[in-house]
Amino acid sequence: MKINTVLFDLDGTLINTNELIISSFLHTLHTYYPNQYKREDVLPFIGPSLHDTFSKIDESKVEELITSYRQFNHDHHDELVEEYETVYETVQELKKQGYKVGIVTTKARQTVEMGLKLSKLDEFFDVVVTIDDVEHVKPHPEPLQKALQLLDAKPEEALMVGDNHHDIVGGQNAGTKTAAVSWTLKGRAYLEAYKPDFMLDKMSDLLPILSDMNRS
């Protein structure tokens, strides 16, 4: 089956938001729980929804913690977000070649739009599924299924690209092929354990992979 659709995670995949996310967590946690959390303590928080993460910390303050996190995140967004090499050129080429491209993210839409605008990727994506659009987040298949439906695409004709196990398992649950990115903050071996179909060392690796898949 040939691939005609590519779905991307956003944070840590298309744009480098690692420092923004870590700083947002540390600011929030230091505000409410001084001197209890270090940088390495918040790395596992990258990937799950804010609600899931903060529920495990303090169920009585979830909404308060989310509000604090998002305020810091918005205020420092543009200074802390960076680009990944070859991302813009690769997505541009995928569109040029006629691929359907979409984003499936656990972020809120407002912050997603900020990131896409800053990285100039906003012109390429017709479909962006955020946490605001679904009841269940990755690795549940719902977000991917929604994106595929909006793109009029079939799972077996799609590839999910991401930096976290939520993306890889989410793709597997939805029936797509999967590609993990080796630049994940959690390390290459972490993602290899989830057996993605492909491992990308840079985003442009996607182009020959898709070419080979569609040649067979």
Curated annotation (Swiss-Prot):
Organism whose genome encodes this protein: Bacillus thuringiensis (strain Al Hakam)
Recorded catalytic activity of this chain's protein: diphosphate + H2O = 2 phosphate + H(+)
Coiled coil stretches, renumbered: none
InterPro entries in the record: HAD-like_hydrolase_sf (IPR050155), HAD-like_sf (IPR036412), HAD-SF_hydro_IA (IPR006439), HAD-SF_hydro_IIIA (IPR006549), HAD_2 (IPR041492), HAD_sf (IPR023214), PGP-like_dom2 (IPR023198), Pyrophosphatase_Ppax (IPR023733)
EC number: 3.6.1.1
Name of protein: Pyrophosphatase PpaX
Function: Hydrolyzes pyrophosphate formed during P-Ser-HPr dephosphorylation by HPrK/P. Might play a role in controlling the intracellular pyrophosphate pool.
Species classification: Bacteria, Bacillati, Bacillota, Bacilli, Bacillales
Domain of life: Bacteria
Family statement: Belongs to the HAD-like hydrolase superfamily. PpaX family.
NCBIfam families attached to this UniProt entry: HAD-SF-IA-v1, HAD-SF-IA-v3, HAD-SF-IIIA, PRK13288.1
A GO biological-process term: DNA repair
GO cellular component: cytosol
Cofactors, names only: Mg(2+)
UniProt KW Mitochondrion keyword: no
Catalytic residues as annotated in Swiss-Prot or TrEMBL: 9
GO molecular function: inorganic diphosphate phosphatase activity; magnesium ion binding; phosphoglycolate phosphatase activity
A Pfam family per the record: HAD_2
Keyword vocabulary terms for this entry: Hydrolase, Magnesium
Enzyme class, first EC level, given as a word: hydrolase
KW GTP-binding (keyword) present: no
